[in-house]
């Protein structure tokens, strides 16, 4: 009896499994009949297996590359997969497509070894003495990622001693970002460069581009033009008139704004500073703000502040007229929010903050400067207030501040939120900051420098997802303070937030060399800094 029931049940089950699927039936019902298995680690395992065969066991090499007498036993497939140059070589009708041995003339043996390391391993140690050659060769062999990383490295390390050579190199390789970085260095150090061999042999079109981009009058650009012409007067005299016509001199602009309070007053004061090349800092003006300030940023040459008795009002300090002008107010009251300038969109973004009811906000709105209009957009992933903000190529990095814990009490935050101003999307980085709470940040090239309470300045590289800690002078670390930071003229300036009246100190860091210089005795009336803007 039991066997009959079992046989009957088995027949019913098979009949059910073999019957055509009814419309709307779930695919899960046929899971044990068939399904597609996808091995998610397959491609990585295959790649690792191929590399092991090629490198560790040195099997299947089918081409020999000879460079300066040294022979490299390599693989056409691997070279072609990484480099369009080699793919074209091996698939063309040229003799290199069939030759077992190929001789390369335009690269040194040591640099080609670095290229092989990169092609096979994906890692390469970039050295300053070979960087320019690696930059050129990686472009020639169409190793795009390596070329772009070399470009970023060169842009970070460009300085007076190599800026003209780097500018010429970037021009040859049609690299606008590197070209702009080198040109900025050249025009702000023209007085130092005008007697160098590199400057005197500079092509006419590069000199024209430098002097037409706005050279500070302190760099004596007219004298530099004369020096260039006189070096080869017979051939260059014809360019004299066009060069003088192209020259655009600019005055010494305000570089840094300090916003803070005097000990005896309740409202804020805006002090404008000029940072000279000899490390001196002078006060070029000051403006009284008859209001409490809750947020501020510098956009172009103008200063924008939000505050007032109704904390949604905004004013602009016109750098040309030194007058305050009304701007469109924010859509709603906001405290402790973060203002960030995005020049590429001619806009100012307001992110996070607190409501008047002391509730954290995740709102993001932006101000279109040309239209004098505020517009709401998508929200932050995590509501924060008092965060540091930095714009890097249209991505706003919101750092630290305060966030809610699980019980909705505020706590110091270590989060890094990234808001893309092109897509209006926000995401949180999977790693956190090395410290929490209130901090201040400034961008230098493709790096973000962050300073907080303590004795450390941190350099954050978003491209590499890495942090580098730089120590401040011991005299500063003895008295904990929330420091402020600004990026100006290729240097990083750090200010303490409290001073003895009338005597402020700051220190200047050169990111290329890590050299630190201290500037003492800046004569300002501020005793408590709220914002430092550059």
From Swiss-Prot:
Gene this chain is encoded by: Kbtbd4
A Pfam family: BACK
Keywords: Kelch repeat, Repeat
Taxonomic source organism: Mus musculus
BACK domain ranges (all copies): 163-255
Gene3D superfamilies: 1.25.40.420, Kelch-type beta propeller, Potassium Channel Kv1.1, Chain A
UniProt name for this protein: Kelch repeat and BTB domain-containing protein 4
Chain's role: Substrate-specific adapter of a BCR (BTB-CUL3-RBX1) E3 ubiquitin ligase complex which targets CoREST corepressor complex components RCOR1, KDM1A/LSD1 and HDAC2 for proteasomal degradation. RCOR1 is likely to be the primary target while degradation of KDM1A and HDAC2 is likely due to their association with RCOR1. Also targets RCOR3, MIER2 and MIER3 for proteasomal degradation as well as associated proteins ZNF217 and RREB1. Degradation is dependent on the presence of an ELM2 domain in the target proteins.
Domain annotation BTB: ranges: 61-128
TM stretches of this protein: none
Kelch repeat copies, ranges: 255-301, 302-344, 347-394, 396-446, 448-497
């Amino acid at each position: 009896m039991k066997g009959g029931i079992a046989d009957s049940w088995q027949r019913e089950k098979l009949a059910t499994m073999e019957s055509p699927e009814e419309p709307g039936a779930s695919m899960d019902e046929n899971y044990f009949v068939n399904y597609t298995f996808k091995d998610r680690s397959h491609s990585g395992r295959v790649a690792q297996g191929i590399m092991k065969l090629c490198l560790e066991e040195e099997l299947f090499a089918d081409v020999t590359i000879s460079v300066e007498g040294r022979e490299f036993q390599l693989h056409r497939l691997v070279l072609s997969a990484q480099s369009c140059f080699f793919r074209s070589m091996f698939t063309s009708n040229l003799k290199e497509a069939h030759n077992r041995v190929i001789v390369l003339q335009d690269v040194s043996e040591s640099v080609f070894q670095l290229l092989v390391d990169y092609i096979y391993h994906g890692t390469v140690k970039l050295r300053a003495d070979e960087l320019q050659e690696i930059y050129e060769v990686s472009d020639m062999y169409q190793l795009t990622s390596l070329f772009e990383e070399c470009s970023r490295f060169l842009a970070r390390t460009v300085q007076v001693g190599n800026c003209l050579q780097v500018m010429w190199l970037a021009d040859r390789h049609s690299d606008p970002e590197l070209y702009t970085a080198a040109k900025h260095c050249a025009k702000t150090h023209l007085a130092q460069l005008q007697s160098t061999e590199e400057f005197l042999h500079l092509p006419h079109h590069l000199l024209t581009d430098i002097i037409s981009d706005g050279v500070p009058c302190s760099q004596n650009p007219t004298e530099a033009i004369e020096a260039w012409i006189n070096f080869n007067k017979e051939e260059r005299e014809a360019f004299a008139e066009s060069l003088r016509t192209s020259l655009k001199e600019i005055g010494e602009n305000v570089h840094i704004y300090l916003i803070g309070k005097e000990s005896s007053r309740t409202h804020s004061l805006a002090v404008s500073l000029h940072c000279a090349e000899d490390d001196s800092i002078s006060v070029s003006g000051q403006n009284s703000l008859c209001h409490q300030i809750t947020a501020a940023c510098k956009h172009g040459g103008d200063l924008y502040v939000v505050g007032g008795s109704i904390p949604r009002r905004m004013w602009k300090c016109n750098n040309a007229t030194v007058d305050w002008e009304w701007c469109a107010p924010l859509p709603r009251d906001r405290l402790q929010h973060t203002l960030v300038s995005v020049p590429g969109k001619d806009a100012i973004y307001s992110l996070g903050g607190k409501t008047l009811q002391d509730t954290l906000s995740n709102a993001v709105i932006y101000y279109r400067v040309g239209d004098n209009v505020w517009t709401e957009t998508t929200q932050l992933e995590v509501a924060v207030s008092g965060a540091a903000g930095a714009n890097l190529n249209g991505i706003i990095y919101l750092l630290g501040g305060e966030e809610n814990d699980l019980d909705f009490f505020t706590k110091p935050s270590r989060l890094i939120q990234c808001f893309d101003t092109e897509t209006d999307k926000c995401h949180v980085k999977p790693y956190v900051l090395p410290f929490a709470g209130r901090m201040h940040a400034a961008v230098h090239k493709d790096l973000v420098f962050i300073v907080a309470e303590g004795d450390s300045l941190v350099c954050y590289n978003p491209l590499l997802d890495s942090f580098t800690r730089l120590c401040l002078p011991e005299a500063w670390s003895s008295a904990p303070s929330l420091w402020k930071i600004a990026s100006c003229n290729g240097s990083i300036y750090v200010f303490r937030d409290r001073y003895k009246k009338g005597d402020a100190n700051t220190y200047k860091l050169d990111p290329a060399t890590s050299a630190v210089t201290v500037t003492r005795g800046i004569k300002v009336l501020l005793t408590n800094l709220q914002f430092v803007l550059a």
